[in-house]
Amino acid sequence: MGDDLLCADLAAAAGCPVLTDPESLDRASRDETEDLRFRPLCVAEPRSTAEVSAVLRWAHAHGIPVTPAGARTGLSGGALAAHGGIALSLRRMDAIVCIDEVNHQVRVQPGVIVQVLQEAVAAQGLFYAVDPASRGSCTIGGNIAENSGGPRAVKYGVTKDWVLNLEAVLADGTVVRTGADTLKNSTGYNLTQLLVGSEGTLAVITEATLKLLPLPTHTALLLAPFPSALAACQAVAAIFQAGVVPSALEFMEREAVEIGRAHV
């Protein structure tokens, strides 16, 4: 069966958009990883868990590789279709399903932009702590797949520390649920944490329940110059030894400051 017929057969079987135009294939061939390009056979854009399952079931039956992708902001090549096949774009699955104000939880689809989630829960007086530098464009699904962190990791940890449970689809199309809607859950294997950071190699995440905190009532930003990197590191150690845990810490060298000043 030729490539065009394969893609048409996939679209019919999965019931979701399957893109084969040059622009879509070119966009799906790269992420923010430098100098790497891998062109897929096609781009499937499911809108539900059922459609993700149908895509994977079809691909499994035909022996065609599938590479899931979010916003393609990653720097480690996790979204690149290195073996060709189907690029599975989850960008259409971008719903915030439910914000649970009582239990401080939120249930989301993988295509939700992190900043959109942060703003939505903040409107309810809640706080999602994971704050990667690309929060304005990266997705929750990508964060989970890569176990993303950010400057706030110093106090709040990384993505794995905020995932309560997952809905995911295995390579053969089987839909599974992991974990529970509780902070303490010691029942069975910890499949949730097995999937976090797996870069889409074990399953495709289609829904996640995340922990939230009450929104901080006060914040302060401090910019402090130091004569040397050693002095800055010593100051950080002294801050922690004094019992103060900042929500975020960032270090900027003099050269970076000068470049920034020259272009702002």
Go through each PLM region and give its residues.
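The start of beta-strands in P-loop NTPase/AAA+ ATPase cores
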Residues: I64, G84-I86, V245
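N-terminal flexible segment immediately upstream of the FAD-binding catalytic core
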Residues: M1-R57, G74-H104, A133, A256-R261
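FAD-binding subdomain of flavoenzyme oxidoreductases
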Residues: A95-I99, Q105-M252
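N-terminal cofactor/phosphate-binding cores enriched in small/glycine residues
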Residues: A71
